[in-house]
């Protein structure tokens, strides 16, 4: 964000501060002009305006600062709440992922057990067939 963008952003946040600054500047310029022309009464009046405009600017700055401080505290709280929600969501997703992986592992173990039982059954049948062949050979 460059300087002009910052000025525009801050002016939108606190529109009375730039107004007070412009009025103060105008009062100083008019006071200098009337001083150069020798109009003492006008010079005094413009300097009094300057003081009033500066006071207005300061009050606007302080009130705006207090307002935005309160607002930024609310935004910070909202941001923290969002971060907490995001953390809870991530935690929930992680738990779901762990449960999914656990189910996959259980399913694999179950398939392994079934395969093991089937292999044992096939092996047992093979051994029995082998014994029968040997017994037939011995009988002959």
Curated annotation (Swiss-Prot):
UniProt cross-references to InterPro entries, sorted A to Z: Hypoxia_induced_domain, RCF1
PANTHER family xrefs: HIG1 DOMAIN FAMILY MEMBER 1A, HYPOXIA-INDUCBILE GENE 1 HIG1 -RELATED
Spans traversing the lipid bilayer: 16-32, 46-68
GO cellular component: mitochondrial inner membrane; respiratory chain complex
Domain of life, per lineage: Eukaryota
Official protein name in the record: Respiratory supercomplex factor 1, mitochondrial
Disulfide bond sites: none
Complex and partners: Associates with the respiratory chain complex III/complex IV supercomplex.
Any Gene Ontology biological process: mitochondrial cytochrome c oxidase assembly
Compartments reported by the entry: Mitochondrion membrane
Protein function: Cytochrome c oxidase subunit which plays a role in assembly of respiratory supercomplexes.
Keyword annotations: Coiled coil, Membrane, Mitochondrion, Transmembrane, Transmembrane helix
One Pfam assignment: HIG_1_N
Coiled-coil residue windows: 68-126
Family indicated by similarity: Belongs to the RCF1 family.
Topology class, membrane: Multi-pass membrane protein
Ranges of residues in domain HIG1: 1-79
């Amino acid at each position: 964000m460059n300087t002009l963008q910052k000025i525009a952003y801050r002016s939108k946040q606190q529109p009375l501060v730039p107004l007070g600054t412009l009025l103060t500047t105008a009062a100083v310029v008019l006071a200098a002009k009337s001083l150069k022309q020798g109009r003492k009464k006008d010079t005094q009046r413009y300097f009094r305006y300057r003081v009033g405009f500066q006071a207005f600017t300061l009050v606007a700055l302080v009130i705006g600062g207090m307002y935005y401080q309160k607002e930024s505290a609310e935004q910070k709280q909202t941001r923290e709440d969002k971060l907490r929600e995001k953390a809870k969501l991530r935690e929930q997703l992680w738990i779901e992922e762990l449960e999914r992986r656990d189910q996959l592992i259980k399913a694999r173990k179950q398939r392994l057990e079934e395969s093991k039982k089937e292999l044992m059954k096939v092996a047992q049948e093979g051994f029995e067939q082998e014994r029968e062949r040997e017994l037939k050979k011995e009988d002959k």
